[in-house]
Amino acid sequence: MKLNEIRDNEGATKARMRVGRGIGSGKGKTGGRGVKGQKARSGVSIKGFEGGQMPLHRRLPKRGFNNIHAHDLNEVNLGRVQQAVDAGKLDANAAVTVEALVKAGIISRARDGVKLLGVGELTSKLSFEVTRASKSAIEAVEKAGGSVTTTFAAGVAHRGAAEGAVASA
């Protein structure tokens, strides 16, 4: 047996029916599409239409909502900040702000601020000025001898400040 000799078993596949090739074929003229109407034309299928049966997207219940007041925060882990300090991208003596994080390349753009998370090891004594911080992050920073100050500015103010930091880089 060779790869080019592999075939389906006899009768395992049904021959393709060519439609619209004369009335003698049994699938001529309208080609199994019925008569006239949108569904008889080419290229038209009605998305989500299940032949009059209640479609899936209407059978399932609605869930949840989108909170228009939610803050879109960048999440930054302590380990990532420590890597930037070790690489010389962040000044360990200056305050770690949103602008400094953008300039160091830790976050690509400031959204509505930054939330500091406690994943990773922090060995440098740093002072953070962020929008929010988790309990584990605050404990880790204070254990390393640093401090965390939470400040909130409107998203537009953060974005403007961060863009200024990138422009001056």
Swiss-Prot record:
Residues 21-35 have a biased composition (Gly residues). The keyword rRNA-binding applies. InterPro entries: Ribosomal_uL15, Ribosomal_uL15/eL18, Ribosomal_uL15/eL18_sf, Ribosomal_uL15_bac-type, Ribosomal_uL15_CS. GO terms for biological process: translation. One of its GO terms (molecular function) is rRNA binding. Residues 20-56 are annotated as: Disordered. PROSITE patterns: RIBOSOMAL_L15 (PS00475). Keywords: Ribonucleoprotein, Ribosomal protein, RNA-binding, rRNA-binding. Gene3D superfamilies: 3.100.10.10. GO terms for cellular component: cytosolic large ribosomal subunit. PANTHER family: 50S RIBOSOMAL PROTEIN L15, LARGE RIBOSOMAL SUBUNIT PROTEIN UL15M. HAMAP family: Ribosomal_uL15. Binds to the 23S rRNA. Belongs to the universal ribosomal protein uL15 family. Part of the 50S ribosomal subunit. This is Large ribosomal subunit protein uL15. The lineage of its organism: Bacteria, Pseudomonadati, Pseudomonadota, Alphaproteobacteria, Hyphomicrobiales. The gene is rplO.
